[in-house]
Amino acid sequence: MDAVSDGRGAIAAAAMDQRGSLKKALAKAKGGDVSDAMMEEFKGAVTEVLTSHASAILLDPQWGLPASKKRAKDAGLLLAYEESGYDNNKPGRLPGLLPGWSVQRLKAEGANCIKILLYYTPFETREVNEQKHAFIERIGDECQANDIPFFLEPVGYDPTGGDEKGAEYAKIKPEVVKQSMAEFTQDRYGVDVMKVEVPINMKCVEGAKAFGGVRVYSRDEALDHFRAAAAVATKPFIYLSAGVSNAEFTESLELANESGVKFSGVLCGRATWKEGIPVYATQGIEAFRNWL
């Protein structure tokens, strides 16, 4: 854990393990196909520039291993173990592992920690969630057998197919985050650190800078949701940026601080670099480095 923390013991990590979503975004901005070399180059530039300001970088073994060699000497390495995305043809957003990889192999590539993203909601069917519970138990056992910390990233969703960025989902998001934290901080899962979403949608907080016009929570209610989710956790947790803008993520962290919750840091990805995608796609690597 020391390898991915700063001198205060806090985790201030950058995330660059996006795969399918990054490739689509680059292809859209470029107006054409994206090669493996471009994926590696983009990840390498982000790693090289941002790790001088971060305690660690989260990468994937598909396109991120060359980038891992470019990180700052004091920056730790987390490697993703899950397959990107999920199978739309099956219900429940069931998880899968990267073929050809194991915790032992990721550790041999220099990983200080293992990360798993899991789509999870307590409002899913019991049958689906039991499969997910067993899946995480197996990963926890594998990490413990290899003596490496396990970071779990539960990402909530609407099992009825609703928009997770909309106001209706914002009403249930606090409960999704809270129950996910209560479930997976149980010892049987072997999770060392939870990488969690903030338990609210900042665009729905009345009076917030990010407020989008539809009120779901007052400021005091939002603060209470932070406290309620943190209260059920029995393991350390950090907040993820979940693709929102840097300004919105910063405002959510200010709210977390105001609430008094004891979070252990952040893992910030797209909020930091996503606006540079068109720069890289249209102007090339040097322009992107300068933008970063």
PLM segments and residue spans:
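Expand to "…catalyze enediolate/carbanion chemistry for C-C bond making/breaking, isomerization
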Residues: 1-9, 128-148, 158-292
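A short mid-domain helix/strand-loop element embedded in enzyme catalytic domains
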Residues: 107-122, 145-164
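Alpha/beta catalytic barrel-like cores
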Residues: 1-126, 190, 214-218, 235-236, ...
